[in-house]
């Protein structure tokens, strides 16, 4: 049982390492996104350093706490989102802006970009409600107990975002 688990974890790490290498090449080859990309224009947000693939999909990066590129999320013109196959996502984020006294944490890129544009404050893209807890933990570890972390969850009818935000807040002392 333990051997099988160790083998699965080793395979996952290998797959994630391969994906990270591939993603790095794709990210480097991509062009800078412009404000007229259909997704950005529809959301009314700046590119914030996002890139585009050769076929026009927006690429937004997922970094580890130490700044290592782990994966990308591809966003089509109509807003369909897909992660790069095999890439790590848990605890990975993208920091928009320079961290200061307060860091916001949002579920998705559009929400984070809107917050960053409206406040001028740093906002981490967690990419999903379920990633709010690990991202908050990674930021708490990186910036310490005194860092003001503010979670901005989606207000979905299901309440999923709020539940994960409450868990992250309770576990890591975020607001």
Model-derived segments and spans:
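Acidic beta-strand-to-loop metal/phosphate-binding motif
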Residues: 146-156
